[in-house]
């Protein structure tokens, strides 16, 4: 299987970042994980420095000024050592075979997104499934997640493009990455993919 670089910006999100990291390491292929620490003060950098993982890369903005998620995604994608990149948030958890399911749909010139499963904190939408696997880290259980998320998998295409998204690094760089106009807003993905299509 081709390796993916999971690009994960994070700011003071250590407990969720650890969960995201573990979920990626639980996949059958050891992918590259690139964590972009954006001036965190919660021990994130210390935790990263203690990891003995040759496929964990870190970029540390010591602050005090933040770069923001848009700038950090762009920096991480530039740093990625694989041909395929995955925009992954620090509070996301990969389900079993997440990588295999994404890669079977990926080809040059396309963007593939994974359907998000979220607790009912935000409004429902066609790009996600509302189901509560725990709002806090200590409420989350990997065994329950892996068992129950299998029943949620469908082989269908949903409308919209949102994180987690995957594409070839070359395709991302060909359109110049994110537009700084949207930094650090939540519409950066929509703009990026409108320019890509």
What do these predicted ranges mean?
Residues 85:
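Short aromatic/hydrophobic "clamp" motif used to bind/position activated sugar donors
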């Amino acid at each position: 299987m081709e390796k993916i670089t999971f690009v994960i910006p994070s700011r003071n999100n250590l407990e969720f970042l650890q969960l995201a990291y573990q979920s990626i390491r639980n996949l059958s292929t050891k992918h590259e994980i690139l964590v972009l620490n954006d001036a965190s003060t919660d021990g994130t950098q210390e935790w990263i420095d203690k990891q003995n993982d040759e496929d964990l890369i870190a970029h540390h903005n010591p602050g005090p000024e933040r770069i923001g998620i848009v700038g950090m995604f762009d920096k991480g994608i530039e740093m990625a050592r694989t041909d395929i990149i995955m925009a992954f948030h620090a509070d996301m958890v990969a389900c079993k075979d997440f990588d295999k399911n994404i890669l079977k749909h990926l080809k040059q010139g396309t963007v593939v997104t994974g359907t998000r499963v979220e607790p009912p904190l935000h409004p429902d939408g066609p790009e996600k499934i509302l189901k509560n696997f725990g709002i806090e880290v200590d409420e989350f259980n990997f065994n329950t997640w892996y068992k129950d998320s299998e029943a949620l998998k469908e082989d269908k295409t949903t409308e919209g493009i949102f994180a987690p998204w995957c594409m070839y690094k070359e395709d991302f760089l060909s359109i110049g990455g994110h537009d700084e106009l949207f930094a650090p807003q939540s519409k950066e993905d929509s703009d990026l993919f409108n320019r890509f299509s």
